[in-house]
């Protein structure tokens, strides 16, 4: 009797997953060489926060934004001009501003940096759109911009100020909805199928989708923003399809068919997993328990050296 190829594929995949998970227990994963953890103290944490705030203050652009195409290291980053740079700057600025606000530093220079960042956000973020049909880098700008807006709403003292940030936040939700992929969720490239479509048909990625949904959830909790439940449901389903039994998440929708390739194994999912776990948990997935969160936090701390390679070495890939 012949076996259908799909049945064989499923069987091999299940066996591979089971063997891999049996071979690698999280508690037995040793720290990467040279990454032994130092015991944290309140003093060391405070010093680290101040160091980060000091960097953001010094690194802020004169117009209140952060980031810019000035240290590319000659890498092959596909960036259609000028929209790609607008998207990256919006994403970097939103992330930096959100972190600066979370640090709650009351020094005058830190307060001034927040004010400059808020002014830039109010003026420039509404202009953000897709650079062209081949990229949706703007998803990062909408998501991290929305995280900053939620915090600016929390800082606002008057109803007029709060209303201003709510309006801008709702605009960002509505804009990013335009760029949801046909498979649910969001990606950042749409150039591999030789199709140019109004609604992206590229590669939706688990981590981009989680980033956008986390920002939406926070915006709804903080400002009462209205979310499109169809968009939310299809995007959550996209993440679930990219989830493996050990709470690793494959890189993209197409990677579902090679779940144990190196990029999709636990070390490859190091930064993706907690974003996706947090997203699913925020939207009510009860399978993302405290144990799952703690397990992946431990794994992250043990293997953070992998991320440092991509962050600091000349060629991140």
Describe each PLM feature range.
Residues 2, 19-317:
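Preference for long, amphipathic alpha-helical scaffolds in soluble/luminal domains
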């Amino acid at each position: 009797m012949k076996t259908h190829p799909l049945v064989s594929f499923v069987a091999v995949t299940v066996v591979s997953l089971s063997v891999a998970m049996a071979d690698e227990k999280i508690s037995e994963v040793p720290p990467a060489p040279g990454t032994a953890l130092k015991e944290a103290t309140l003093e060391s944490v405070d010093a680290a926060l101040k160091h980060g705030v000091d960097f953001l203050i010094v690194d802020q652009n004169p117009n209140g934004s952060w980031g810019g195409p000035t240290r590319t290291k000659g890498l092959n980053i596909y960036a259609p001009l000028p929209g790609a740079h607008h998207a990256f700057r919006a994403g970097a600025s939103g992330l930096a501003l959100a972190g600066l606000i979370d640090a709650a530093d009351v020094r005058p220079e830190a307060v001034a940096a927040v004010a400059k960042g808020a002014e830039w956000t109010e003026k420039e973020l509404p202009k953000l759109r897709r650079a062209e049909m081949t990229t949706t880098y703007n998803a990062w700008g909408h998501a991290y911009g929305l995280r900053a807006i939620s915090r600016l709403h929390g800082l606002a003292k008057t109803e007029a100020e709060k209303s201003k940030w709510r309006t801008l936040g709702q605009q960002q939700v509505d804009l990013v909805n335009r760029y949801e992929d046909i498979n649910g969720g969001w990606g950042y490239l749409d150039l591999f199928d030789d199709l140019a479509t109004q609604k992206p048909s590229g590669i939706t990625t688990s981590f981009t989708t989680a980033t956008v949904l986390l920002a939406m959830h926070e915006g709804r909790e903080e400002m009462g923003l209205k979310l499109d439940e169809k968009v939310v449901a299809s995007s959550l389903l996209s993440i679930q399809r990219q989830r493996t039994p050990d709470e690793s998440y494959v890189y993209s929708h197409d990677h579902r068919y090679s779940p144990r390739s190196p990029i999709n194994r636990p070390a490859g999912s190091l930064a993706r997993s907690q974003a996706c776990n947090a997203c699913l948990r925020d939207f009510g997935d009860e399978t993302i328990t405290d144990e799952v969160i703690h397990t992946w936090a431990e794994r992250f701390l043990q293997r953070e050296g992998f991320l440092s390679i991509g962050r600091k070495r000349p060629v991140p890939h």
